[in-house]
């Protein structure tokens, strides 16, 4: 098949490196692993550069490979019986860190931590929908899944994310009230002892 588009490797890397890294980071929750995945994706793209037919095809291909490599990395971790979420909390101190900061100051970090707790398929669908602004049909194509399955993952993922966010917010309010009470020497906010 002949086509007029001539891919430029450096230009494609420049244009898409942040997208590929961001997808890998949101899927794995691990910055170092996301960097490795992004590097692997671009090395593979270099080997398949002649097969890319257009700029849109290159973007689609990069998203698909980034999502697949991220899923592979998560599966390898599971096989080694490493609980990724506990590891993330231990490495990055998410629980202690989020409890110590004001709610609004770290909303992005809190959302990232909650997103990381979702099942892989739901997390993938949400990341592609809300980070990449893809339609359910485009997500289905990227993940090689039926559209109905993608819509289900989106619906269930949002429902689970909302439930976990509500629970997290209640826990934050409870911790904050307890801390404020201790700081006030046992005096409640309405002045009662």
Regions from the language model: what does each represent?
Residues 2-3, 39-57, 76-78:
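Sigma70-family region 2
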Residues 21, 42, 119, 123, ...:
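C-terminal flanking helix
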Residues 125-129:
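A short pre-motif secondary-structure segment
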Residues 1-22, 32-38, 46:
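A short, charge-rich alpha-helical start-of-domain segment used by transcription regulators
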Residues 67, 71, 143-170:
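DNA-recognition helix of helix-turn-helix
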Residues 2, 80-108, 113, 135, ...:
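Internal acidic/polar
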Residues 53, 64-85, 104, 156:
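Arg/Lys-rich amphipathic alpha helix in sigma70-family domain 2
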Residues 22, 36-43, 56-68:
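Structural recognition of an alpha-helix C-terminal capping motif at a helix-to-coil junction
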């Amino acid at each position: 098949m002949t086509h007029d588009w001539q891919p430029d490797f450096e230009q494609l890397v420049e244009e898409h490196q942040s997208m590929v890294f961001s997808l890998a980071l949101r899927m794995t929750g691990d910055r170092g692993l996301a960097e490795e995945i992004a590097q692997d994706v671009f090395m593979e793209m270099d080997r398949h550069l002649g097969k890319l037919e257009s700029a849109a095809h290159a973007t689609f291909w990069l998203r698909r490979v980034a999502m697949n490599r991220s899923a592979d990395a998560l599966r390898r971790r599971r096989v080694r019986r490493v609980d990724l979420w506990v590891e993330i909390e231990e490495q990055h101190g998410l629980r202690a860190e989020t409890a110590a900061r004001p709610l609004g100051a770290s909303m992005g970090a809190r959302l990232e931590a909650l997103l990381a707790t979702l099942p892989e398929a739901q997390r993938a669908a949400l990341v592609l929908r809300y980070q990449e602004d893809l339609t359910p049909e485009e997500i289905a194509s990227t993940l090689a899944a039926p559209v109905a399955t993608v819509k289900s993952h989106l619906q269930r993922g949002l429902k689970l994310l909302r439930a976990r966010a509500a629970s997290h917010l209640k826990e934050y309010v409870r911790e904050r009230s307890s801390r404020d009470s201790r700081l006030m020497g046992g005096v409640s906010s309405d002045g009662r002892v």
